[in-house]
From Swiss-Prot:
Residues 216-408 form the GMPS ATP-PPase domain. This is GMP synthase [glutamine-hydrolyzing]. Pathway: Purine metabolism; GMP biosynthesis; GMP from XMP (L-Gln route): step 1/1. GO terms for cellular component: cytosol. One of its GO terms (molecular function) is ATP binding. The active site is at residues 99, 189, 191. Catalyzes the synthesis of GMP from XMP. InterPro entries: Class_I_gatase-like (IPR029062), GATASE (IPR017926), GMP_synth_C (IPR001674), GMP_synth_GATase (IPR004739), GMP_synthase (IPR022955), GMPS_ATP_PPase_dom (IPR025777), NAD/GMP_synthase (IPR022310), Rossmann-like_a/b/a_fold (IPR014729). The gene is guaA. Residues 22-215 form the Glutamine amidotransferase type-1 domain. Signal peptide: none annotated.
Amino acid sequence: MTLTQQDASTVEKLDETLHEDRILILDFGSQVTQLIARRVRESGVYCEIWPFTATEEKIRAFNPRGIILSGSPASVHDENAPPIPNVVFALNRPVLGICYGQQAMCQMLGGKVESHEHREFGRAYIDIAEDCSLFRGVWARGKREQVWMSHGDRVTQLPPGFRAVAHSEGAPFAIIADEGRRLYGVQFHPEVVHTPHGAALIRNFTHNVAGCSGTWTMAGFRELEIARIRKQVGSGRVICGLSGGVDSSVAAKLIHDAIGDQLTCIFVDPGIMRTGEADEVVKTFRGRFNIRLVHRDASELFLKELAGVTDPETKRKTIGRLFIEVFEEEAAKLGGAQFLAQGTLYPDVIESVSFSGGPSVTIKSHHNVGGLPDRMNMELVEPLRELFKDEVRMLGRELGIPESIVGRHPFPGPGLAIRIPGDVTKEKLDLLRKVDAIYLEEIRRAGLYDAIWQAFAVLLPVRTVGVMGDGRTYDQACALRAVTSTDGMTAEVYPFDFAFLNRVAGRIVNEVRGINRVTYDITSKPPGTIEWE
């Protein structure tokens, strides 16, 4: 397959249609900036997140229909408080300032912001005093609405042209508007789920205020990305590391739809996957989709290298190194490929913002193959780099990938190895697989799987005394974990009823020889992390 002028023209036309309406989100360091982008995308509008340091030239070239200013951990009174670029208001486009974004906008345009002893953190209620385009059809004058606040500073004097349209106990200017210039500010966070109608408010901004029509769809993205892949690859060959996870599965199917047998997938089975997952990968991609697939069973190698390793970080790094080494071996056998496919997502490419001047603390190393392209002298194909995880799942459904794959709970790259605190052995893996399979089977049977962000079992490195029949046992304990979340950044424990937990625990201790005690982890994130290691 060779590139033609028609291919290039197709890419240009599809790209223009899909990205015609776009919103720019300027990031001032908020931990939830990505949630703003997800709400915008959910409204059918393409958007990008850029740091507040973006140049005027770049912002003008992007030509957004509207601009959203994020929150920030900073105060507008800090010596190095992040400023709003002057071009934001020079463009005469609609602007929505959120929390710090509202405060910085007010201060820049002639208002006043002060620290106040009455701070608002968590659930709060605002009273709607006047009608406003920002929430027309969502909230009505005279109503009280629930929102989520997180601020110490507050606006105390509005800039010329603005009016207050809502207030709360701790924020006299909870929502402000300059309808003439289409400038709006909210002291709360509409992007979080704790503001019940926040997504509708953001949709109002993108559609009713900024005039976007909602051209961003996964059907359109699929068509565009297939054309892009054909344009980039031409008649070249692509190899793709297939893990069985959502990202690599969707990337592989999308690329195969574009170039067919020019793609070869390499599936390295490390022996640390859940029950039946390795077989499902082979069955789905080789059998159902007819994708060229190299299947390497490397379980013995991984177990040998992990023997005696107890430190979680060392486990992760060992597994990551082995994946790369085995992948390189198999790729070398194939020979002749010019392109390497990766399931890079948009959160991976967003430029992070730090006000401390130093790197952020590494809580856990992320398992990826970021070192491969330079070492292998190959050009990257990253068909998912514009997408968030939830969009990848939607695209997977558009591509016809089974729900058992696209709807699967997040699973860490190091697999079950980090769900076994201490050293990893085949016996421990077999034990954990049995426990995990029973737990997930019961969750599905109860119709709860899709209501839970992530559920799994952990094999604890402790033995406990028990009684089975007339005899004493001294076997291992396991922990069950289930959380709800929207993005994995924060998580709440799932509130199973006791009857469910009792049923699961009963099955585990009766059906899994070697387990005599079951616990349920009720720790939220923070302070805990979702995974144990």
